[in-house]
């Protein structure tokens, strides 16, 4: 009994800072909550509430002047701007990849479409991760708000930014590929072949044989898998990746789900990815068919049911994993 009691004392005396660091790390989350009022449960929030600091070498020069003039102190506005740009980059790469696939006749290649879906998400998350979180998905934003990882007020701000960034990206990609679209239209006949072939650039459409029930279940299940994976990757208690690898883990998750379940209905999994480009395609002349497709039994499915799938995923993750973590102050595993 004496040896057992002496062993930890000896180690503490040998390196007195190690145990102190461990104790400090154990209560790091509580300290962060008390200082910022935010839940530290996600990798993507690692700089969200950090105080802005001016480096000394900027003071007195034009960089410092513009930084001082343009800097916005309102946290929600900063979140909106960051998430808008993150979503803009994500959707620009995604829609640009979709356009290239259509022009080259490879729109039905699941590996190609999965790759540009996944890597587009990777770089979009990198843009917004340090400020807004870079969630770039209204359904996942709803899921993390449901679990208390972001406030509902911030949730609404991020969702509006995501829809906005997606819409602007749709417009920019259309302008960039305008001449290519016109040239591609010359090869189409007068029976709407051009619209049928290129509408898939902007939004998802189901296979002709897919029933409404099958489409609903597809959207719920795909987004549920995405939600479970995303919440596990971002859970600080789980075996999560480092901050720098977090976007790659999410991108790999998106690629995997897309490869597995995109055949029947496109696996949108993201309301802003589908609705905003669909609105843009209506504006540029694709007609009401982008909404009336399948007798109005489709357009609302990839918009509404990803929210349902994200909700199911959040509930399942909490029931099967989240609520079973040991107490924060407990050292036992």
UniProtKB/Swiss-Prot annotation:
Entry's transmembrane regions: 85-105, 116-136, 156-176, 213-233, 245-265, 303-323
Coiled-coil segments: none
UniProt xrefs under InterPro entries: Aquaporin-like, MIP, MIP/Aquaporin
One protein family per Pfam: MIP
Membrane topology label: Multi-pass membrane protein
Cellular compartments annotated: Cell membrane
UniProt KW keywords: Cell membrane, Membrane, Repeat, Stress response, Transmembrane, Transmembrane helix, Transport
Region (Disordered): 1-26
GO-annotated cellular components: plasma membrane
Record carries keyword Membrane: yes
UniProt motif (NPA 2) ranges: 270-272
Sequence motif NPA 1, location on chain: 137-139
Protein induction: Transcript abundance is medium and expression is slightly down-regulated in the inactive stage (during anhydrobiois).
Entry similarity comment: Belongs to the MIP/aquaporin (TC 1.A.8) family.
Description of its domains: Aquaporins contain two tandem repeats each containing three membrane-spanning domains and a pore-forming loop with the signature motif Asn-Pro-Ala (NPA).
Full protein name: Aquaporin-1
Designated gene of the protein: AQP1
């Amino acid at each position: 009994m004496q040896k057992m009691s002496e062993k930890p004392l000896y180690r503490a005396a040998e390196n007195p800072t190690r145990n102190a660091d461990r104790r400090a790390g154990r209560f790091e989350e509580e300290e962060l909550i008390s200082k910022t009022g935010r839940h530290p449960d996600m990798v993507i929030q690692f700089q969200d509430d950090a105080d802005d600091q001016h480096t000394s070498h900027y003071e007195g020069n034009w960089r410092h002047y513009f930084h001082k003039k343009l800097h916005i102190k309102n946290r929600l506005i900063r979140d909106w701007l960051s998430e808008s740009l993150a979503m803009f980059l994500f959707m620009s790469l995604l829609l640009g990849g979709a356009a290239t696939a259509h022009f080259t006749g490879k729109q039905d290649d699941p590996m190609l479409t999965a790759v540009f879906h996944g890597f587009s998400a990777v770089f979009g998350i990198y843009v917004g991760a340090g400020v807004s979180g870079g969630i770039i998905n209204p359904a996942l934003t709803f899921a993390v708000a449901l679990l208390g990882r972001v406030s509902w007020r911030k949730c609404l701000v991020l969702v509006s930014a995501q829809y906005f960034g997606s819409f602007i990206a749709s417009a920019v990609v259309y302008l960039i590929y305008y001449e290519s679209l016109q040239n591609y239209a010359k090869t189409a006949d007068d029976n709407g072949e051009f619209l049928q072939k290129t509408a898939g650039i902007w939004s998802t459409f189901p296979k002709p044989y897919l029933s409404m029930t099958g489409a609903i279940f597809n959207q719920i299940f795909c987004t549920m898998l995405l939600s479970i994976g995303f919440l596990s990757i971002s859970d600080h208690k789980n075996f999560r990746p480092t901050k720098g690898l977090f976007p790659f883990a999410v991108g790999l998750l998106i690629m995997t789900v897309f490869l597995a379940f995109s055949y029947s209905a496109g696996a949108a999994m993201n309301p802003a990815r589908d609705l905003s480009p669909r609105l843009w395609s209506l504006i540029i002349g694709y007609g009401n068919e982008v909404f009336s497709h399948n007798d109005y039994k489709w357009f609302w499915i990839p918009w509404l049911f990803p929210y349902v799938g994200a909700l199911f995923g959040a509930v399942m993750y909490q029931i099967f994993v989240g609520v079973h973590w040991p107490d924060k102050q407990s050292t036992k595993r």
